[in-house]
Amino acid sequence: MAEGGAARGTREEQGKLPEQEEEEEEDPQVLLGSGHCKWFNVRMGFGFISMTSREGSPLENPVDVFVHQSKLYMDGFRSLKEGEPVEFTFKKSSKGFESLRVTGPGGNPCLGSERRPKAKTVQKRKPKGDRCYNCGGLDHHAKECNLPPQPKKCHYCQSTMHMVANCPHKIVPQHPTTSQGRYEAEPQPSTSSFQREGGGAFDYSSPSYSQEGRSELSERSSRSPQEASLSKISTSPEEQSRKGPSVQKKKK
């Protein structure tokens, strides 16, 4: 029984330990410090204090302490000026040192910074002049016009004889365009120059054939390869007699 009671006691003690640790974390030790404002962001509302004295004893190296605008003791817009002397209470947290209440020297209100956050500038459209589409007046709209419906006018010269699309006073530069809406390119010559090894250039143009030559080419291309081979084999005797002397000359 004694062993069982001892085990229960150890379990209860172990169960209380985390609770005690939480209570200690919730109630940290409040310390006193003094120093000056290192920097403060007026728009975001926070900054850091450079602590030079802790509990009345000076520090060799200044320590940074976080400060929020809600912890400042002052009236109006709460902020700190860079280099402003302050006194404060602070605590130690998992993120570092955080200030709890910040005042000026001797518990007086903080002076604060002269800077103010800039208001967001909303870009507004420029107000266009109101014009009546019926009579052209600038002090009312067409639905408020007292005149009866007026004839349509050219929006460029206010003439009733034509519309703005046919206005002779409005000059629109026109460029020649193709069917696809692109500008026509200047015609380029069909000749192409080739560079020689010696550095000169000569023009080469496509040969111009007559109608007879084109008909012969079309007939040749329409022939089958078998007909072409037969035409080579079946040559006339006149052609053979013509070729004969030339062959004899070559043999000599």
Swiss-Prot record:
SMART domains: CSP, ZnF_C2HC. Transmembrane segments: none annotated. InterPro entries: CSD, CSP_DNA-bd, Lin-28_RNA-binding, Lin-28A-like_Znf-CCHC_2, NA-bd_OB-fold, Znf_CCHC, Znf_CCHC_sf. Zn(2+) 1 binds at residues 132, 135, 140, 145. Keywords: Metal-binding, Nucleus, Repeat, RNA-binding, RNA-mediated gene silencing, Zinc, Zinc-finger. Gene3D superfamilies: Nucleic acid-binding proteins, Zinc finger, CCHC-type. One of its GO terms (molecular function) is zinc ion binding. Belongs to the lin-28 family. This is Protein lin-28 homolog B. The gene is lin28b. Zn(2+) 2 binds at residues 154, 157, 162, 167. Residues 32-105 form the CSD domain. It comes from Xenopus laevis (African clawed frog).
